[in-house]
Each structure stands twice: as C-alpha cells, then as structure tokens.
C-alpha cells in the first residue's frame, strides 16, 4: 500500500512535466515508437526517456507513444484481453507511423513466484508461462502491423542497498524483506539468469530484437560513494569502494554492486525503477544499438567532416580551426562555423535523394541562441569546393556562397553532447562536389541582445562511443545496373543465423567477389575477399549491435543486409 501511494503521488506530479514540442522546418512531430509494458514502460513514457534520447541524437522531431499501453503492475495478460487488448489494437490502428514497438513487459508475471532460499531454476515454469503470454502479445501486434519491429529490452539491476538499508519505511522495504534481503550479487545473478531466458525466447520470433541492459547504469554513472556495510537489521554487506563511470564491463557490469542510486527513480528512493536520467540512458542504449540506423534512413554514405579544415570565422576578421563556433561571444563578435567534407568518392552518376548533417554541441558560452526563434534564426550555406582556401579565412564570413539558406535545422541542442540535425533541401544537392571538397557555412541570427550566445561544436575528429563527430549522411541511387539492392527477402543471398553470436554464414546463388562490414555511422569495420558460394564470417572482434553487410558480386551488382550481433 505504501508503495502504491508513493507511486501514485509521484505520477500526478509527473503528468505536469510536458516539455514544449521541438521546432523543425514544418514543426511536425512524428510518433514512431510505441511502448507496451508495465511500470518500467510507464515510467519510461512519463519521463519521456525516448523523447529526450532522440533529441540527444538529433531527432527532436520523433517521439514515443505509451500513455494508453503502459500500466504499473501490468502483466502479459493485461494486453491480451479486455481493455488492455483494445487499447493496444487501437494504438496500432490509429498510428500507422509507428515503426517500432518496445515491449517492456514480463517481469510481473513471474518475479513474485520466487521464494527466498529456492534455487532460481524454480522460476523456469513461471517464465515459460510468461513466454506464452508474450507470444500472444506479439501475435496481436503482428495481426495488425506485421511490418513493425519489436524490441525487447532487458531490465537492469535493482538497488535495495542505498535506499533501503537505512530507511525501513521505504515503500520497497517489504519487497526486499519478502525476498530474504538478497545482497546485490544474489539479486544480480538471478537477473542474469532471467534475462538469458527472455533473450532465448526472443530468438524464437523473427524480427524481435533483444537489447541487453544489465550493468548499463553501473557503466554510465559509476558508483560515487562506497556502499554501506550494515543495516539496522544486522544484515552484513561488505563495504565496497566507489568506481568511476565506464570502468566496469558492459554488459553485466560488476555483479557485486547494485545499480547506482543516482540512476534510480523517486529521487533515489526507488529500489526497482530508474529515474529520468537513468531512463534516458536506457533509451539511448536502444537507439544506438537498434533504432539509429533506421532513423537515419540507412544512408548510402556517411562522411565525417575534415577536422583539419573545420573551424570558424568571425565578424572582425578573426578565424581559426578545430572547434566549430557559431553565435556571439562575450565581446558580441558574431561567429560562423565552417564545415568541410571530402565528397570526391560519391559516384559521378549518383542520383542524390537526401543529405543530412549532424553537429554535436561541445560546450556553450552564455545563452543558447537556438532557444529563441529557432529554427528561423539558423542558416546553412553550401559551396561546391573550398569557400576560398581549404582553411577558414577572414573573407569566408561574408563571401557569397553557391547557394544560401539551404537547410532545415532540427533540434535545439539544449545540453552538451546533444546533436542538431540539418536536412538540406533538394535544390542544394547539385552543389555537392563529386570530385573534391564541399564546404558549408553555418550562422545563427540570435535574437538574444547584448549577451553571449556562442555554441562550440565537435569537429569530425571527435572519437567516442557516442556519435559526437560532425558527419554528413548522403542518400543516393545509382543507375539500375549498379543500384544497391536492399530487399530484405532478396533470394541472391541468405545470411544466418540472425541475430548472430560470433559468426554468420552466407549462402548465395551468385559468385561473390568481396564483402564489407560497416557500423551504423557508415564507417568501414572490415573487408573480406570471398570467392565461393558458402562462407562464414567471424564477428568475434566486433561489438554487439547492428551492422551493415555489403556484398559485392562478380557480375557488378551489390547487395546490402542488416546484421545484428547479440
């Protein structure tokens, strides 16, 4: 009862936290993600975890749905009968724009069947029963929308230690007590067993993608303080030292530690659920591993900007390379950013169908210029070739470009490491230099008067596990005889198993000359020479997640396949 009252009060507070919709050229927001689930799904939706993570990656015009399809305490049966089933069907029918369904569901079906002291294997029958319910949920979704992908994220570890060990009045204390006061190692190894069962179930369904999140919060947040050593009940827990972010392995983390309290909900007093920051990290993990490639439209080519030639120029004739500076500094000098891309490898006969540029905020001086009348105050100009020379020069500030004001800016980049996406209009495509360098100039006409509003962005040399580097996605088609074939059921090549663990097999009806594997940003990971019809490719050295396999046939055709390493 304590727990339900606490959650109910908190949800009333959360319902008032609705951010203003982001602006875009058409100020149009599309709901491409549907969350179906229990309390994890409901908190994810109420905290707008996906919405905020999508802003982080430059997709402020995309958001999630879930108000009618997430309920605290929900089980699989909630969505397979009665009002829950009706709501699920209605959302799928009313929103044809949905492309991915996230199932944050299943835990409530079996977790309460566990009695302290029993081996974890006693849950096998309950998990099997839960999987039958999950089968029914999937069938309901497939009946209406057979085309959508279904994402099954794991949960992450609980934290009974920090919020409960000194506060027996916590609404989750009864749950901890009913499980026999398990320490983090006991709770975490049980979670690993359960999630392995859930992952195995996901592999029995086509087009379901399991995303492992165990240990994610440990990896991202670290443990700031050492853990307590005793509880009021005399329960002993060894004091463990703090650790810095990104120093434990991911996935799975350190089994001796709980999820850090900083990631937990209810201001750190929740033992099970994440808070706003935690759910944003949770959503960002799914976006990077599963959604980002689709949101970017599977670009034909991705080019990092040339960090040596990237830079800035300002209104008093100063200029420099390195950071990309845009806006007004503290002396009210206006800065314009210069981006340089080597586009010489784009085929001469390529028919360009789309170009998007992503720039990521590194830091800010003063106010955010994009918060005023964005996007009307943001402008990008294009030059076929260098503006003057390859490096920024004073004249670059005012020189006439080949075409000006050619892009739609999406995303205000209201935090460091947030990206703004710039979609170029089709009139600008003809100015892409297919034999050399294409340069861009970006400026902000901030309405913030007499104060600094300077944004500094990463250039193309920023290397990190996050996509921080300035880059350009190019979509193009080739004449029919060279056109890349992307039909998912193309009979020329079969790739199996998918998802894959350590290797994939290729079986083709045509002779292969070579294959390449790229990551979701289009960066080449490896090249292989292949000459026979049946081949194996070792994925052991690649990180888990989505990759693109490109197959080059000896007849000159090319085929692409999306592959997932789990």
PLM feature segments, named:
Residues 4-13:
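Sec-dependent N-terminal signal peptides
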Residues 30-36, 40-128:
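Conserved SGNH/GDSL esterase-like catalytic core that processes O-acyl groups on lipids
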Residues 85-265, 269:
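Alpha-helical cap/lid subdomain in secreted, periplasmic
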Residues 297-344, 445-449, 459-477:
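Flexible, small-residue-rich N-terminal segments that precede or flank a structured functional core
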Residues 334-335, 346-356:
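Extended extracellular/luminal ectodomain segments enriched in beta-structured repeat modules
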Residues 341, 351-364, 472:
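A short beta-strand element within beta-rich, extracytoplasmic domains
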Residues 364-437:
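Beta-strand-rich interaction/scaffold domains
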Residues 488-496, 500-566:
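C-terminal outer-membrane/trafficking sorting elements
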């Amino acid at each position: 009862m304590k727990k339900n009252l606490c959650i109910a009060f908190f949800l009333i507070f959360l319902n008032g936290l609705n951010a203003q919709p982001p602006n875009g050229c058409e100020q149009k927001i599309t709901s491409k993600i549907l969350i179906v689930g229990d309390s994890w799904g409901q908190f994810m939706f109420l905290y707008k975890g996906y919405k905020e993570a999508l802003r982080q990656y430059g997709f402020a015009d995309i958001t999630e749905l879930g108000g009618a399809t997430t309920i605290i305490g929900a089980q699989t049966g909630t969505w397979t009968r009665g009002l829950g089933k009706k709501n699920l069907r209605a959302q799928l029918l009313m929103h044809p724009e949905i492309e991915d369904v996230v199932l944050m569901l299943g835990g409530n079906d079996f977790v309460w069947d566990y009695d302290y002291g029993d081996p974890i294997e006693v849950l096998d029958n309950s998990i099997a029963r839960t999987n039958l319910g999950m089968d029914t949920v999937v069938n309901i979704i497939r009946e209406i929308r057979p085309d959508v992908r279904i994402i099954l994220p794991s949960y992450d570890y609980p934290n009974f230690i920090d919020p409960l060990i000194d506060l027996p009045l916590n609404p989750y204390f009864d749950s901890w007590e009913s499980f026999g006061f398990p320490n983090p190692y006991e709770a975490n190894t049980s979670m690993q067993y359960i999630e392995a069962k859930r992952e195995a179930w996901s592999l029995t369904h086509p087009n379901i993608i399991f995303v492992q999140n165990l240990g994610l919060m440990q990896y991202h947040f670290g443990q700031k303080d050492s853990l307590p050593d005793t509880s009021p009940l005399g329960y002993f827990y060894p004091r463990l030292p703090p650790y810095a972010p990104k120093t434990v392995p991911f996935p799975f983390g350190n089994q001796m530690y709980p999820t850090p309290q900083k990631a937990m909900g209810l201001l750190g007093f929740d033992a099970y659920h994440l808070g706003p920051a935690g759910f944003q990290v949770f959503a960002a993990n799914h976006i990077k591993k599963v959604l980002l490639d689709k949101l970017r439209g599977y670009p034909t080519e991705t080019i990092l900007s040339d960090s040596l030639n990237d830079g800035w120029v300002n209104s008093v004739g100063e200029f420099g390379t390195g950071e990309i500076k845009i806006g007004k500094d503290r002396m009210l000098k206006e800065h314009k950013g210069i981006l340089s891309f080597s586009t010489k490898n784009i085929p001469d006969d390529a028919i360009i169908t789309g170009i998007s540029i992503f720039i990521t905020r590194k830091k800010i001086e003063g106010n955010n210029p994009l918060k005023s009348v964005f996007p009307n105050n943001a402008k990008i100009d294009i030059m076929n070739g260098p503006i003057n020379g390859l490096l920024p020069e004073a004249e670059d500030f005012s020189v006439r470009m080949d075409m000006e004001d050619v892009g739609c800016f999406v995303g205000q980049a209201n935090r460091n490491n947030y990206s703004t996406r710039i979609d170029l209009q089709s009139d600008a495509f003809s100015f892409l230099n297919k034999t050399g360098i294409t340069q861009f100039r970006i400026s902000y006409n901030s309405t913030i008067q007499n104060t600094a509003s300077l944004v500094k962005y990463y250039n193309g040399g920023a290397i990190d596990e996050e996509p921080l580097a300035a880059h350009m996605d190019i979509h193009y088609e080739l004449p029919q005889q060279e056109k890349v074939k992307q039909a998912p059921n193309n009979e020329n090549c079969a790739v199996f198993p998918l998802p894959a663990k350590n290797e994939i097999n290729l079986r083709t009806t045509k002779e292969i000359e070579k294959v390449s594997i790229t990551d979701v940003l289009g960066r080449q990971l490896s090249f292989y020479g292949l000459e026979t019809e049946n081949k194996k490719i070792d994925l052991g050295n690649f990180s888990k997640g989505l990759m693109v396999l490109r197959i080059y046939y000896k007849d000159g055709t090319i085929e692409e396949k999306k592959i997932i390493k789990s």
